From Swiss-Prot:
SUPFAM superfamilies, per database record: Carbamate kinase-like
Protein name as it appears in the record: Acetylglutamate kinase
Function: Catalyzes the ATP-dependent phosphorylation of N-acetyl-L-glutamate.
Reactions it catalyzes: N-acetyl-L-glutamate + ATP = N-acetyl-L-glutamyl 5-phosphate + ADP
Cited NCBIfam families: argB
EC main group: transferase
Organism whose genome encodes this protein: Bordetella petrii (strain ATCC BAA-461 / DSM 12804 / CCUG 43448)
Entry GO MF terms: acetylglutamate kinase activity; ATP binding
Length: 300
């Protein structure tokens, strides 16, 4: 039988020193590099995980990395919709967004959720600034039509949901240069000023590509990508992903997450990971330790 570790021993100065020593080569390797984090799931709704996330982001910035946060907010949007008597519906993992829902999305993501994240990071010593797609023309978009498997000639209209047409990273780079931590809401804007709801995983993937990020980390509510038996898949190739799409192993909200991760890997992001946001300090574990957590996505 294995003895239960003594908590005092685990938190001893020697253990802490060993952890710092393990992190040093990673700090050196990733110094000055951009790390894009898709922040969502339980990590956004449980206080201990919120604080863990904020501390991780601030520490990464303090040791010389450049974290960029792209946040979701699905549960918060659902709560706001319920208060006005609406229920959210989804097609292929994308939220159907009529005009009234779009107003709620803008208010929740660009206001309440974003400001909560900014304040949380600032309270633990960071300097965070909130952005939406409108700021500096950051995220330009057009209406998205979903593929209709039953009738390919008639795509599915899901309302004010957008496809990204262009990302202008200048405002993000300027904030990074001035030691700020950008916090980006996944709202894009069309040429006529129309606001579009864009899946946060898609925004995170595209932001990582355009910024030339070293790493893209997608936080989720599972240990990573699981096979049909519930076993964690430590790494996924492009071919394996196609197979998992085809047999339905990857479905629902995981579809845009994996598709965006694979696109990022194919377009120059050196390392893409699906990480378990329920694990405290999952960002530090993935970036600054030998072990890491979750599933690595490869374009090969």
């Amino acid at each position: 039988m294995t003895d239960t570790p003594d908590p005092a021993a685990v938190s001893s100065p020697a253990i802490k020193a060993a952890v710092l020593s393990e992190a040093l080569p990673y700090i050196r390797r990733f110094h000055g590099k951009t790390i894009v984090v898709k922040y969502g799931g339980n990590a956004m709704t449980e206080e201990r995980l919120q604080r863990s996330f904020a501390h991780d982001v601030v520490l990464l910035k303090l040791v010389g990395l450049n974290p960029v946060v792209v946040h979701g907010g699905g549960p918060q949007i659902d709560d706001a919709l319920r208060r006005i008597g609406k229920q959210g519906t989804f097609v292929q993992g994308m939220r159907v967004t009529d005009a009234e829902t779009m107003e709620v999305v803008e208010w929740v993501l660009g206001g309440q959720v974003q400001q909560d994240i900014v304040m949380m990071i600032n309270e633990v010593g960071g300097k965070a600034v909130g952005l939406t797609g409108k700021d500096g023309m950051l995220i330009q978009a057009r209406k998205k039509l979903m593929a209709n498997k039953e009738n390919p000639q008639e795509p599915i209209d899901i309302g004010f949901v957008g496809d990204i047409t262009q990302v202008e990273p200048a405002v993000v780079k300027a904030l990074q240069d001035d030691q700020f931590i950008p916090v980006i809401s996944p709202i894009g804007y069309g040429e006529d000023g129309t606001a579009y709801n864009i899946n946060a995983d898609v925004v995170a993937g595209k932001m990582a590509e355009v910024l030339g990020a070293e790493k893209l980390l997608m936080m989720t509510n599972t240990p990573g990508v699981l096979d049909k038996s519930g076993k964690l898949l430590r790494s996924l190739s492009a071919q394996t992903i196609d197979e998992l799409f085809a047999d339905g192993t990857i479905s629902g909200g995981m579809l845009p997450k994996i598709a965006s991760s694979l696109d990022a890997a194919k377009n120059g992001v050196n390392s893409v990971h699906i990480v378990d946001g329920r694990v405290p300090h999952c960002l530090l574990l993935e970036i600054l330790t030998d072990q890491g957590v979750g599933t690595m996505i490869s374009s090969h």
